[in-house]
Curated annotation (Swiss-Prot):
GO cellular component entries: large ribosomal subunit
Similarity-based family: Belongs to the bacterial ribosomal protein bL32 family.
Name of the protein: Large ribosomal subunit protein bL32
Example of a GO MF term: structural constituent of ribosome
Any one GO biological process: translation
SUPFAM superfamilies, alphabetized: Zn-binding ribosomal proteins
Coiled-coil ranges (or none): none
Alphabetized UniProt keyword annotations: Ribonucleoprotein, Ribosomal protein
Domain of life: Bacteria
Pfam families: Ribosomal_L32p
Organism for this UniProt entry: Fervidobacterium nodosum (strain ATCC 35602 / DSM 5306 / Rt17-B1)
Length: 60
C-alpha cells in the first residue's frame, strides 16, 4: 500500500484546497433586443427574447 514519504504541510494543503473551492465569475453579455445584461445562451429576463425569438411574455 502506498504511504507518503513526508508530511504535507498545512500551508500546502490550504493552497491546494483554495484552487478547488475557488469562486469563478459568471460571463455576462448584452441582450441584442433590449441591451440589458444577461448570461450567454439564456433567455433575457427583461424582455423575454432568446436571440430574435420571443420565448415568454414579460408582465409590465
Amino acid at each position: 500500500m502506498a504511504v507518503p514519504k513526508q508530511k504535507r504541510s498545512s500551508s500546502r494543503t490550504h493552497h491546494k484546497r483554495a484552487k478547488i473551492y475557488k469562486a469563478f465569475s459568471v460571463a455576462v453579455t448584452t441582450c441584442p433586443n433590449c441591451g440589458a445584461p444577461k448570461q450567454p445562451h439564456r433567455v433575457c429576463l427583461r424582455c423575454g427574447y432568446y436571440g430574435k425569438k420571443q420565448v415568454f411574455e414579460v408582465a409590465k
